[in-house]
Structures are given as structure tokens and as C-alpha cells.
């Protein structure tokens, strides 16, 4: 079996990870019908209204602190983002307050910044604390009343009025904070559109929202028809608008077309450099090929679930945990993690070597069916004809937006 990743690479990635995210609770005060932890899906731990114990989180922070003090850490004094995730994280505000205090008192050689994704149902009660600690907030809102109608309370009633009331309150009380630190996230489905979401949030709050598709990984067999009924593709929704050029430019990287063109450019341009060493001394043409576009574990973040599972990301199924933290400490075996990843990569390499899109691939292998039994197939595979169509689509984008090349190359940091 080829050694695509080594234990040392993974340990170094964790020591220098730019973000730690805690699933502070699996409880939620909404029952969104497309929720990744809801009726459509099967790849998550059972939701039991649990709260992550502060001692568990502190134990993990102490483990990370030892790595920060080790030779593996080459990002001393860099920003480290600490995220609070749910469920609805504001249901466990005591945890958040205690962990923020613990980090501030720790004397670590890191600059901590805090972020949170929230449904805003409890924002009116806790906004002062969030503003005081300069939290970056990502508020979930799918547009107007009809657009937002899949986001319902436990009693089946709409959440829209209460959410908008609380967001309006934050906007009025802290306008400067709101302008700098608050953004919106929307999910596209059969009751809204890219233009409708953008129009509502732009008009009411002066913000351009991030818009994502409903998660298409881990769908239960008996819910596939329901998923298909609700699902809409953001790229297709964007192209259906008469003024889609204007929307594209305004959304920039939040636009699926800009995002796709950016990845294509960053992976193919001879003028893109990973660091100053590449710029000054040339690129390493002998870098190890890793199948798919899957991140090196912990290179972007580390995620701790409410049950103490450790994952490289909150977006993948909980069956792919790579470690655990509990009363006995942190259990992370870097050699075992490397072996697991290398086994997956070995399964995928033959197919990836034949794919003409391997240089620009962003396919996460954890979204592929059959990964665990060694029979995975990649939905993103491209033969020569498919890749040429993809290439022509990206080049046509730059013909349509001649200023986009300069904008992307000057303003985008791609990792």
C-alpha cells in the first residue's frame, strides 16, 4: 500500500490547524425539514439533546496546547478560530462562556477568534456577550416567509417572524458590529431561489448571503424521493435569472460559477504559488499525488462532537471519526489515521489516475458511496470529453467576465 500520508504530516496538521470547532449540543429549538441531522439522513449519531461537557472540551484544549508548545507547531501567534456548532449552540451558552474564559486565561501563543452558526432564535438573550467577544456570526435564513418555511419550530409553526425580529434587534443595537461581523447562510430548495434569497437579505440587511445546496450525502434509502422533491441546484437556479451576470459579480466566491472558475484557475495557473518558497525557488514537481480533493486531516479544522468523537470536519458522517476525547483523555493514533486514509486512497487511485480532472478535483472522498467497503465510485469522474466541456465552461466564464482573472488572482487566498 502506498504511503500518501505519514503520521508526522497528520500530527503537524493538527498542531497547526487554523480552527477548532466544538459541537456544543445536539439539541435544537428548530426542526428544519432538510437538516443534515434530520429525517432525510442516516450518517450521524443519534440526537439525544446532549450537551458537551466543558471538562471534555478543556481536556481537548489542553491536548492541543501541548502540541502548540511542541516543535510541530510552526504557526506561533497565528489566529486560531474557535467555532461553536450545534444543534443550536446558544442552547448551551454556559459552555461557550466558560470555554472563551478558559482560552483567554490559558496564556497560549495563539490569537483566538470566535465564530458561530446560529438560527438566531435566542439571539436577543445573548447578543451582548457575542458582541463583547467579537464573535463572527453566520445566521441561517432562507429568505422571506415562504422561502424560509422549511425552518420550523418543534410545534410545527414557522420560525421566520421570531428570527427576523431578533436579527433586526441586533442590527439596531449594534450597527457597526452587524456590518463587520454578521453574515447570512441560506439553503436552496424548492421553495426559494438564488435571486429570491439574495434579494430579500440584500434589501433588508445589506448583506450578500452564502447559498448552498441541500446536503446530498448520507441520504436514507426511504427518503430519496423526498430529497429529490426538495433539492434544487444553485448553479442552475443562478442561470435561470435574467440578471445573473449582476448576481454573479455581487456574490463573487459565494456564486457557484465564480467558485468553480476560481478553483479551475488556482489549480491550473502557472502564476499561483502556495508560499514564498515556491515563488522564489520554484515549485516542487515531485509532490506526492493524493487521490481526490480530500483535505489532509486537520489541515483546515478539527471537529469535536457532543459525544467526544474527533473528526477532520463537521460536514462528513460521524462514522468517519478518527479519535475520541473523554474522561480518560484524548485518544488520537496518528499512525492509525494515516493507515486509514492510505487505504482509502489506494482504493481510489486507479480511478483517479484516469480522471482528466485530477488536478482541479475538489471531491471529498467521504461523500462517495462505497468508501468503507472498497467499492467506491466517484460522481465527479471526467473522461476527455467531459473535461473539455468543463474546461470550455470555465474559459467562457473568463471571456464573459474579463476582469475576474485579475480580481481572483489579487484577492483570493486559496488553500
Describe each region flagged by the PLM.
Residues 292, 309-310, 315-415:
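Flexible mid-to-C-terminal extensions adjoining Fe-S/redox cofactors in radical SAM and related proteins
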Residues 20, 82, 114-116, 137-139, ...:
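Hydrophobic faces of well-ordered beta-strands that scaffold small-molecule active sites
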Residues 150-164, 168-293, 297, 307:
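Radical SAM enzyme [4Fe-4S]-AdoMet core and its adjacent flexible, acidic
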Residues 131-137, 205-207:
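Glycine-enriched alpha-helix->loop->beta-strand junction motifs that scaffold or abut catalytic
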Residues 24-31, 298, 352-354, 358-359:
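Cysteine-centered iron-sulfur cluster-binding motifs in ferredoxin-type domains/subunits
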Residues 3-126:
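Conserved alpha-helical substructure of the radical SAM core
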Residues 41-42, 89-91, 120-124, 136-157, ...:
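Conserved radical SAM core fold
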